[in-house]
């Protein structure tokens, strides 16, 4: 495939994105050869539309979207908002990529706008983030669970979700069917004690 424009450098692309988004970009950072753009929830849809349509950006494809839970980030030293939605965007025509991040403004009820109307590939990705993290995507036309079982309680990728879950499944001989019941396994520490010690291996 021949591109109409040669790929620009990462720093040049970062400057272009910062110029296009203006005040809608809370930060534009470059690390490990990748650009990460963070926007406020109120500017999420407008910023996403600009990244898709603006000359020099043209990110026509959303490759991936996932949720993140920062509640235990940096060993509990992180004091920002808990839930984040991170997307990876690709410009096929300009051969360039960017990561777009937005934090949910309310930790107790995480909500951001759906970008399904901008990139329809976001449909199942947003359902997955809703299922696993409990992030609500306002404007999504079919926000149902997609991976967990019917009647599943909670959101299993949240840092405070118990490793044993809330219910277990077993075959009941009397009823001659599979049933669900509260878990009978007691939670226990699965990390070897030596690794849990402070400053193990010089780690801070």
From Swiss-Prot:
Its main location: membrane. InterPro entries: NADH_DH_suC, NADH_quin_OxRdtase_su_C/D-like, NADH_UbQ_OxRdtase_30kDa_su, NADH_UbQ_OxRdtase_CS. It catalyses: a quinone + NADH + 5 H(+)(in) = a quinol + NAD(+) + 4 H(+)(out). PROSITE patterns: COMPLEX1_30K. GO terms for cellular component: plasma membrane. NDH-1 shuttles electrons from NADH, via FMN and iron-sulfur (Fe-S) centers, to quinones in the respiratory chain. The immediate electron acceptor for the enzyme in this species is believed to be ubiquinone. Couples the redox reaction to proton translocation (for every two electrons transferred, four hydrogen ions are translocated across the cytoplasmic membrane), and thus conserves the redox energy in a proton gradient. Belongs to the complex I 30 kDa subunit family. NDH-1 is composed of 14 different subunits. Subunits NuoB, C, D, E, F, and G constitute the peripheral sector of the complex. This is NADH-quinone oxidoreductase subunit C. It comes from Polaromonas naphthalenivorans (strain CJ2). The lineage of its organism: Bacteria, Pseudomonadati, Pseudomonadota, Betaproteobacteria, Burkholderiales.
